[in-house]
UniProtKB/Swiss-Prot annotation:
Keywords linked to the UniProt accession: Amino-acid transport, Cell inner membrane, Cell membrane, Membrane, Symport, Transmembrane, Transmembrane helix, Transport
GO molecular function: neutral L-amino acid:sodium symporter activity
Gene Ontology cellular component terms for the protein in this record: plasma membrane
Protein name: Serine/threonine transporter SstT
Reaction catalysis annotation: L-serine(in) + Na(+)(in) = L-serine(out) + Na(+)(out); L-threonine(in) + Na(+)(in) = L-threonine(out) + Na(+)(out)
Transmembrane segments: 16-36, 46-66, 84-104, 143-163, 180-200, 218-238, 300-320, 332-352
Physiological role: Involved in the import of serine and threonine into the cell, with the concomitant import of sodium (symport system).
Gene from which this protein is expressed: sstT
Length: 414
């Protein structure tokens, strides 16, 4: 008679559901912050290490994946970058428009009394776009060190096309390097429960949420608008693309991408997570290896919402009337600003003065609005990143599935 041994604890942890493990890490992090504040602050190192590891591996992952996919691209094989790019831009503009409607329906006001410190926002939209264009011609080593994904994409695409003319041994080497980096990414992601345990513990211990209660209405409008975009606007765009129930895909992306992004608060750190999810969904590698890092740079629905809501809150506070054409123009400006947010230190918050300038709001008052943004940043930045990053993989999957459906229907007709 033989007895079958039950799998050990380590084996269960290594092969169990990552989402369930993350939930356990989340609960344990909250409990530790509640029981012992010093201990919770100490384990914050685990979260810092996890986010640092993701940020470290993401640039080289993007470089190798894009190089490998372009170098090994077969002639005549179609990618779906243009449809995805269109979805990115449409999604960002739709988010800004939804934020305008939400802000009119639930107007918020601010207490403009704090200072934003020595922060230098860009002087205009031209400067934002100039920074975005200049990042394309960055030194490749500098781009890798600083996580400049526009620069990394440009070099990876250029080297990929150049390597198309190389011999098969070189192409195989690039492909093997890409697979090796992908393996390292999977290894890092397995430590997500420990990392999120550290992040949650330290965040609750060091900041708490007591300071957020003074801005409860503003946060409700911000987070409510982001939920509206995630659960209504994005599903409508996905349904328009794939013509079937979008919610299984939407909820999967929120669960397996948005949860990570919420706690890491970094679109760059979430690139490896999104790449792994695309592989799990069996999407075209040539497509997602380009669209995911591109989305982390320009697909900024959450940033568009933040810029729009905080700007209109300042407008309401000062009693400035806003007509429909001006509101539509604000949506366009917020969308353009959001697309350039990755190239600005401080991200979406420091682009608020550009939008405020539309209404003749002085820079001093605009920087006080930015200061409010930093106060609520614990929750605002987490929700914004979760929406931005989960939308990257959502729109990539929608475009790839739509193309697969088109090819299948074409084959049936023939």
């Amino acid at each position: 008679m033989t007895t079958q041994r039950s799998p050990g604890l380590f084996r269960r942890l290594a092969h169990g559901s990552l989402v369930k493990q993350i939930l356990v890490g989340l609960v344990l992090g909250i409990l530790l912050a509640w029981i012992s504040k010093p201990a919770a602050e100490a384990v914050g190192l685990l979260g810092t290490l996890f986010v640092g590891a993701l940020k470290a591996v993401a640039p080289i992952l993007v470089l190798m994946l894009v190089m490998a996919s372009i170098a090994n691209h077969q002639h005549g094989q179609k990618t779906n970058i243009l449809p995805i790019l269109f979805l990115y831009l449409l999604g960002t503009f739709s988010a800004a428009l939804a934020a305008v409607v939400f802000s009119f329906a639930f107007p918020s006001t601010l207490h403009l009394s704090s200072s934003a410190g020595d922060i230098s926002p860009p002087s205009g939209i031209v400067e934002v776009m100039r920074g975005l264009v200049m990042s394309m011609v960055s030194n490749p080593i500098d781009a890798l060190l600083k996580g400049n994904y526009i620069g990394i994409l440009v070099w990876a695409i250029g080297l990929g096309f150049a390597l198309r003319h190389g011999n098969e041994t070189t192409k195989n080497l690039v492909n093997d390097m890409s697979n090796a980096v992908t393996f390292m990414v999977k290894l890092v992601i397995r430590f997500a429960p420990i990392g999120i345990f550290g992040l949650v513990s330290s965040t609750l211990a060091t900041t708490g949420f007591s300071t957020l209660w003074g801005y409860a209405q503003l946060l409700v409008v911000l987070v409510g608008c982001m939920l509206l975009v995630a659960l209504v606007v994005n599903p409508l765009l996905v349904w328009w693309k794939i013509r079937r129930n979008p919610f299984p895909l939407v909820l999967l992306c929120l669960r397996e991408s948005g949860v990570y992004a919420f706690f890491t608060r970094s679109s760059a750190a979430n690139i490896p997570v999104n790449m792994a999810l695309c592989e799990k969904l069996n999407l075209d590698r040539d497509t997602y290896s380009v669209s995911i890092p591109l989305g982390a740079t320009i697909n900024m629905a959450g940033a568009a919402i933040t810029i729009t809501v905080l700007t209109l809150a300042a407008v309401n506070t000062l009693g400035i009337p806003v007509d429909l054409p001006t509101a539509l123009l604000l949506s366009v400006v917020a969308s353009l600003c959001a697309c350039g947010a990755s190239g600005v230190a401080g991200g979406s918050l420091l682009l608020i003065p550009l939008a405020c300038n539309m209404f003749g709001i002085s820079n001093d008052i605009a920087m006080q609005v930015v200061a409010v943004g930093f106060i609520i940043g614990v929750l605002q930045d987490s929700c914004e990143t979760a929406l931005n990053s989960s939308t990257d993989v959502l729109f990539t999957a929608a475009a790839c599935q739509a193309e697969d459906d088109r090819l299948a229907n074409s084959a049936l007709r023939n």
